[in-house]
Curated annotation (Swiss-Prot):
Its main location: cytoplasm. One of its GO terms (cellular component) is signal recognition particle. The keyword Plastid does not apply. It comes from Caldivirga maquilingensis (strain ATCC 700844 / DSM 13496 / JCM 10307 / IC-167). This is Signal recognition particle 19 kDa protein. Belongs to the SRP19 family. The gene is srp19.
Length: 100
């Protein structure tokens, strides 16, 4: 898998407890509190996307904090930009937490 073949989606990208300057990508209304890697992977699976989970990877800006461990590599598809993909993943995680 070459570097250009996938987007990296970090747990921190959809975490409502994190500021945008520290790595959150989506608006706070779409973000969820402390998302798990499993929730994000399940959302990617629900969208029918190919991905690889990497639970040991640490966010580069927060390599020393255990709260920010884990990311998934999502293979690129023409239907999404990285930002729109992360928004869609956040929506799915948020709705699954509500039970819907």
């Amino acid at each position: 898998m070459g570097k250009k073949d996938y987007w990296v989606v970090w747990r921190i990208n959809i975490d409502s407890t994190v500021s945008r300057s520290n790595g959150r990508v989506v608006p706070r209304q779409l973000a969820v509190d402390k998302p798990t890697l499993e929730e994000i992977a399940k959302a990617a699976s629900m969208l029918g996307l190919k991905y690889e989970a990497h639970p040991e990877k640490k966010h580069p800006r927060h390599w020393f904090e255990e709260d920010y461990v884990g990311c998934i590599y999502v293979y690129k598809v023409d239907d999404y930009s990285r930002r729109s993909l992360i928004k869609k993943l956040a929506q799915i995680v948020k709705s699954s937490r509500r039970g819907g």
